Amino acid sequence: MRRFLFVLALLCAFASTARADESLFYQPLNADASLSQEQWRQLWQATARQGVHTLIVQWTAYGTEDFGGPHGWLAQSLEQAHAAGLQLVLGLYMDPAYYQRLSELDGPGLESYWQYQLGRSLTQQRILRRDWQLTLTAWYMPMELDDLHFLDASRRQSLQRQLKDFSRQLDAPLQLSAFSAGKLAPAVYAAWLEDIASLGIQVWWQDGAGTGSLPAPVREAYAGALPCHIGVVGEAFRQTSAPGQAFQAKPAKPQPIGSACHPRALFELRYRPWAAVLLEAHRNSGHP
């Protein structure tokens, strides 16, 4: 009996570890354009061999940058990712000034800003369908949520209405992610994410290990309050830049957190051991 329980524990541990890499975020950067098509092919094949089945592309438009458009390096790379067997979740439009604007705007201003940004994402969705013509399983909204800028209940209620309307206009399921600044109690925060998930949206919670903005016991409390269908994103990096500086990070081993019942993803591709070519391209670009 003891041997059976030991084997069962090993299997559960293996299943938890295997799930951790099933979905993987990729954040496109201009520096990535330096990779050849052969390098991309090898990278995506290696990613699939690692057990990843879904690639979540954080954005396909960042301000005025569209990464070459329908015939550019990003579109061609994602075609190769799909050919390697990876399912694609395509990110939409991201405003580079998003976090600055969140801090500047009051309630009515924030609602108007969000409405405009969601409109930009709808436009990007139509461009991707019409011009890029990639096979996808879901859309991803790049604008991350947190309980600092949405601490006020009225802001969360307004956002809920906007997300409901937005998701109904998409032709595939919507995914988004959130992180905690420690402003809402874990149970209240979990209930907020559950409300969003009730719209049919796949919600991902970022574990915050990479930025280290919250102590580990606090992060554990937030993870422990989450319903099982809320996904957990392990941050496979450690931030090396100081607050207020341009973001810099180095690869790090993800740390398990929360129950094994959650869907799992990692952030992000360039910090994984088999994707060193991406990290090197970024460092060689001279950009932060």
Predicted region positions:
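Active-site-adjacent "subsite" loops/lids of carbohydrate-active enzymes
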Residues: 90, 96-126
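Catalytic domains of carbohydrate-active enzymes, especially glycoside hydrolases
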Residues: 37-63, 195-204, 260-264
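Aromatic-lined carbohydrate-recognition surfaces of secreted/lumenal glycan-active proteins
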Residues: 89-97, 140-144, 163-189, 204-209, ...
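Substrate-binding cleft of secreted/luminal carbohydrate-active enzymes
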Residues: 205-216, 221-222, 227-288
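Short, acidic/polar
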Residues: 33-48, 121-128, 185-195, 247-256
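Aromatic-lined substrate-binding rim segments of carbohydrate-active enzymes
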Residues: 40-47, 56-98, 155-172, 219-225
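Boundary/entry segment of secreted carbohydrate-active catalytic domains
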Residues: 19-54, 58, 180, 270-273
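Active-site groove signature of glycoside hydrolases
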Residues: 123-153
